[in-house]
Design a protein with these regions (language model features):
Chain B
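ABC-family P-loop ATPase nucleotide-binding domain
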Residues: 1-23, 233-248
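ABC family nucleotide-binding domain
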Residues: 10-226, 231
Length: 426, 248
């Protein structure tokens, strides 16, 4: 054991001396690994970023909220079975809330109705088109975490009275009010004046997934007064708005029970006979996730495979240079064997040499990748880049493995050299 | 040639070879490099192996140095059967029992004298402090105590061979196997190296010298001549001047 440690130490020393005396060659060879590690690391970072962006967008949906909708949150082949379903009315929320209140030990907390449409918003000379305009109640803050950068979300009184107030997203505020505070200013939405009472904190958009940054929210009563969804829905070619009801669950570990309870309530609300199939869908974040996860995983696997190829090319470079190194130092190998180096010792020596090269490449690669991530983060702040400690460890392990694998064949051939032949080699 | 007597009492048998042969396959042909060599070498001997090229001299040296195993025959090193050892066992024997001195020195070019001499000790698994101590001592013994941090390219040919001899000595081997140790040196430096070997012999080391030069072989106390893979002659030699030097 001790002897192994001394041999290991000796091998590192040789590897270091070898790299120093063949500086150009070592750096050029390591460059292959550098490029490979940069590619793999950036890919890993991008995948991590996708994950984070995805999770962030998912967090908007909330993992303890059920969504009652006309369409299920998944691809359906028999769309005709869903097309003719009755719309989800916002009034169901009141029904559900009544039943929740009457049910002891209900798994549900509160139902919140939402209606949405795409609308243009104006302030002075600035205009934003196609803003996701949401009408809801003050309970909305229970189902979604809304951070206000300025001002506040509307309260229950404003909600019930249908006050003409609005909470606007970060990006909307940015365009409409480039140089002043939007609070207490009045914006025009489809010709109606609304007072801005709050601005959401920046959330960041990702891959076009939903974000609070480009939306506005107002009391449902006001929404219904000015943008009657029922009329809208019947006009062809109009922006198709839609309504749904979201219900907060008490305990997210009991999501299934909550779902069953909500299904029962909805059947009652819709007056469905027991033999009838449900004509509504109850969705949760998980359903959405399970449709998107395979896509995300495919991107990750394909991406890592392709970038992995560049690392593989780097590994071939290392293998090549280790073969050269073995050839050049055949006589030295012979001498070492004559002095008592065993096969294992020689094997170890060359393995460590190739590993040291890969580690050097890996280290430089990581540094480059780190600065590139930093640069990308500065240039595209909306892209959620994720340079983690785990990634550093992972790429170092990958470097070592690359070194061991690419060095193995040359090191093995070195360890098998016949001492007599090796000594005679010129 | 008149006073044929051993210089001093010989020790136990270190190398015992009986009827060994070695065949090489060279393409279609089988080259029979050794055709039955028997030999006994005792501790404290100073032996020269001579012979023209092609006589099997190098092959015999490889056998004696445990770098290769014979095709047939018996080879015992300190009573252990070497002929049937595997690579790693042979490496262990070479490490502990044999000190090699090569014609081309075979030092590691980028390592200091100290590191070169330490090498066999590393392979023996010795701790760094002892290694350092013993390597320094060995270098001092060959007169290079002030050159331990020099690299081979900062040393003269003679000094390099001294480093190589220190490396051969450092693990306190049973035999020192010197293959044409003066072949790459001028005659004056060569004499210095031979004087160093003589000195080692006087300090109870066992030396096997492989050479084709008669005056180099003349330093030894016993000379074996090989021809066509067999021992042609095996005789004790005596060099009066050296005895005088040693006695004084």
């Amino acid at each position: 054991m001790k002897r192994f440690l001394y041999e290991l130490e000796e091998s590192w020393r040789i590897a270091y001396a070898q790299m120093r005396s063949n500086m150009t060659r070592s750096i050029l060879t390591a460059l292959g690994v550098v490029i490979g590690i940069v590619a793999v690391t950036l890919m890993g970072t991008a995948i991590g970023g996708i994950q984070v962006g995805f999770d962030k967008s998912m967090a908007v949906l909330g993992d303890d909220v059920l969504y009652v909708t006309q369409w299920p949150w998944k691809a359906v082949d028999d769309w005709w079975n869903y097309r003719d379903r009755k719309k989800i009315q916002t009034e169901y929320a009141e029904t559900i809330n009544r039943i929740i209140a009457a049910t002891p030990n209900s798994n549900l907390v509160v139902a919140v109705p939402t209606s949405s449409l795409m609308r243009s918003i104006k302030y002075g000379g600035n205009e934003v088109e196609n803003v996701f305009t949401l009408g809801t109640t003050s309970d909305f803050t229970v189902t979604s975490t809304i951070d206000c950068k300025e001002g506040r979300f509307f309260n229950e009184i404003e909600s019930r009275s249908g006050a003409q107030v609005v909470v606007i997203g970060y990006d909307v505020a940015d365009v409409l009010f480039p140089s002043e505070s939007p609070i207490d200013k009045s914006v025009l939405i489809s010709g109606h004046l609304f007072k801005v009472i709050g601005v959401n904190a920046r959330q960041g958009t990702f891959l076009g997934l939903f974000s609070w940054d480009s939306m506005v929210a107002m009391p449902l009563a006001a929404f219904n007064k000015y943008f009657n969804l029922k009329n809208q829905l019947d006009v062809p070619g109009q922006n198709q708005g839609e309504s749904d009801v979201r219900v907060k669950v008490k305990d997210k570990t009991k999501l299934a029970e909550a779902k069953d309870e909500l299904t029962g309530i909805m059947r009652r609300a819709r007056g469905l006979l027991p033999e009838k199939k449900e004509d509504f869908s109850i969705n949760e974040q998980q359903a959405f996730k399970s449709t998107l996860d395979p896509v995300k995983n495919t991107i990750a696997i394909a991406g890592l495979f392709i970038t992995g190829l560049s690392l593989f090319v780097g590994a071939i470079g290392i293998m090549n240079i280790t073969f050269v190194s073995v050839k050049e130092r055949t006589k030295e190998i012979g001498t070492r064997k004559a002095l008592g180096a065993r096969r294992r010792t020689i094997l170890l020596q060359f393995l460590i040499e190739s590993t040291a090269l890969c580690l050097l490449g890996g280290f430089i690669g990581l540094t480059v990748a780190y600065f590139m991530c930093f640069g990308i983060g500065k240039a595209f702040p909306s892209f959620p880049i994720q340079f983690s400690f785990g990634l550093v460890i992972a790429s170092m392990i990958v470097s070592v493995l690359t070194g061991l694998m690419s060095g193995f064949a040359p090191a093995w051939s070195a360890s098998r050299l016949d001492p007599v032949t090796a000594l005679r080699y010129e | 040639m008149d006073a044929r007597q051993p210089v001093r009492q010989l020790g136990p048998v270190v190398i015992d070879i009986e009827n060994i042969t070695k065949d090489y396959v060279m393409g279609e042909e089988i080259v029979r490099a050794l055709r039955g060599v028997s030999l006994q070498i005792r501790r404290n001997e100073y032996l020269a192996v001579m012979g023209p090229s092609g006589s099997g001299k190098s092959t015999l040296m490889n056998m004696l140095g445990c770098l290769d195993t014979p095709t047939s025959g018996r080879y015992e090193f300190n009573g252990r059967n070497v002929a049937e050892m595997d690579d790693d066992e042979l490496a262990a024997i070479r490490n502990r029992e044999i000190g090699f001195v090569f014609q081309t020195f075979n030092l590691l070019p980028r390592a200091t004298s100290l590191r070169n001499v330490e090498l066999p000790l590393i392979y023996a698994g010795m701790d760094p402090e002892t290694r350092m101590e013993r390597a320094t001592q060995a270098l001092t013994d060959v007169g290079l105590g002030d050159r331990i941090q020099h690299k081979p390219n900062e040393l003269s040919g003679g000094q390099r061979q001294r480093v190589a001899i220190a490396r051969a000595l450092v693990n306190n081997p049973s035999i020192i196997l010197a293959d044409e140790p003066t072949g790459n040196l001028d005659s004056k430096t060569g004499e210095e190296i031979m004087a160093l070997l003589e000195d080692l012999y006087q300090r109870n080391h066992t030396i096997i010298l492989v050479t084709h030069e008669r005056d180099i072989a003349a330093h030894a106390r016993r000379t074996i001549r090989l021809r066509d893979g067999v021992v042609e002659s095996d005789e004790s030699t005596f060099v009066p001047q050296l005895e005088t030097v040693a006695a004084s």
